[in-house]
Amino acid sequence: MTALVGPSGSGKSTVAKLIAGYWDVTSGSITLGGHELKDMPLSEIADQISYVSQDNYLFNRSIRENIRMGRPSATDAEVEQAAKQSGCDAIIRKLDNGYDTVVGSAGSHLSGGERQRIAIARAMLKNAPVVILDEATAYIDPENEALVQKAISTLTVGKTLIVIAHRLSTIVGADNIVVVKDGTIHAQSTHEKLLETCPLYRDMWQAHIGAKDQM
């Protein structure tokens, strides 16, 4: 796992969107599997990357159809298995129409946390080799955070994982943590090393711990 952290507005989400191919770089290059992203068809990039953000868009269609967008050929059983793995199956089944519930424009009939879990289910169904999580637990309440973290762990087994996190406690075990400041890489290392060598990261960690203590 590679984690991107930094102050608000430092450029973390911009990096994630560049990696996902949403924008083109104006200098330098981004490679995926040894190939420059700018030379790859958008359809191929989309097949290789699952992008789960804090603002996941859902279409005004059924929950089943929204999850199935991850892999249009998936069976109903596969859709429901992905929902179970992401921790939203029980929630869906409590709805009057279950998986056939229409979510409303942009998923407006669901809470932010419910939309995120459906987006994670869609990513699980897609099973792409590269997973980008852009503050994917931003709307998850503390009671369900452990469940969603377990779902994310299942989603990312054997995959290249890039995480942008606002809760630093979720990325302390990352193989590499990249501290982004003012659009540049300020420092990068493990959690323990950054606590020793990077004042900015240390301040962010102390602020995070202080906020948790006040909850």
Where is each model-derived feature located?
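ABC-type nucleotide-binding domain
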Residues: 1-215
